[in-house]
Amino acid sequence: MLLKRLSGLGYEWRVGNKTGKKLMTTRFELRTRYIQGWYELDADKLISSTSHDFMFDDPAEPEPVNRASLPEYMIRWDKRTRLLGATNVWDLSDEVCQDRDGILTDWEWWELVGTDLCGMAIVKTRDDGVFFERITYFD
């Protein structure tokens, strides 16, 4: 049975009782940079980790966010969540990752600490960058 877990340096794998490390591929590095960009509210990190055909789907937005509009969306997101009491401290849990056919797909439950804001996210990354994210909100 093969188990994988994302980490800051690579992903771990285990087959039977043997454990090892494999260097991260570009898509793992880009996914890590993308989430760091959100944690740090760093537009440069976000843009540099996305592909040219990037699309972000947030049901609170009137239309999908593309790569060019991502920095403005990040500012709107920060203002909107701070009005709810958030300080951009995230709690991600129940993460599931799949690396298949050159696409890293990551699902997680997210919560903004200090608020009732929570939901699910799916993020898809290729070796040219994060190309898709969709978030949902739950009450």
Predicted features, each with a name:
Residues 2-6, 11-22, 61, 71-139:
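A beta-strand edge to alpha-helix "cap/lid" segment located at domain peripheries
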Residues 38, 42, 54, 78-81:
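Short amphipathic alpha-helical segments enriched in hydrophobics
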Residues 23-42, 49, 73:
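Short, aromatic-enriched amphipathic alpha-helices that serve as compact interaction elements
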